[in-house]
């Protein structure tokens, strides 16, 4: 199951420049991170769900590309976002 409307709105409010900012890289990365974290719980129960795992890998790849773009364009917001999301880098 995907994220609820309320959860997405909270993420957009926390990471966006305003309440309707859904397109910025920071918001997109935060939404992808929430979806990835949600799917990790799914895979602890359903180890053989390879179809969903392919979707997870696609999300991880998209997040990596967005983070690389953000690192090229604005290093300060990249570092801030990584710390706020608790990602490794």
From Swiss-Prot:
SUPFAM superfamilies per UniProt: S15/NS1 RNA-binding domain
Keywords recorded for this protein, A-Z: Ribonucleoprotein, Ribosomal protein, RNA-binding, rRNA-binding
GO biological process: translation
Keyword hit for Zinc-finger: no
GO molecular function list: rRNA binding; structural constituent of ribosome
Matching Gene3D superfamilies: 6.10.250.3130, S15/NS1, RNA-binding (1.10.287.10)
A Gene Ontology cellular-component term: cytosolic small ribosomal subunit
Complexes and interactors: Part of the 30S ribosomal subunit. Forms a bridge to the 50S subunit in the 70S ribosome, contacting the 23S rRNA.
Family the UniProt entry places it in: Belongs to the universal ribosomal protein uS15 family.
Function: One of the primary rRNA binding proteins, it binds directly to 16S rRNA where it helps nucleate assembly of the platform of the 30S subunit by binding and bridging several RNA helices of the 16S rRNA. Forms an intersubunit bridge (bridge B4) with the 23S rRNA of the 50S subunit in the ribosome.
Protein name: Small ribosomal subunit protein uS15
Source organism of this protein record: Yersinia enterocolitica
């Amino acid at each position: 199951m995907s994220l609820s409307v309320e959860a997405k709105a909270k993420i957009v409010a926390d990471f966006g420049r305003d309440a309707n900012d859904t397109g910025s890289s920071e918001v997109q990365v935060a939404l992808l991170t929430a979806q990835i974290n949600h799917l990790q719980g799914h895979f602890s129960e359903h180890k053989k769900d390879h179809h969903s795992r392919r979707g997870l890998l696609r999300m991880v790849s998209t997040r990596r590309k967005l983070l690389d773009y953000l690192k090229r364009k604005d290093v300060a917001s990249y570092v801030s976002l990584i710390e706020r999301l608790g990602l490794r880098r």
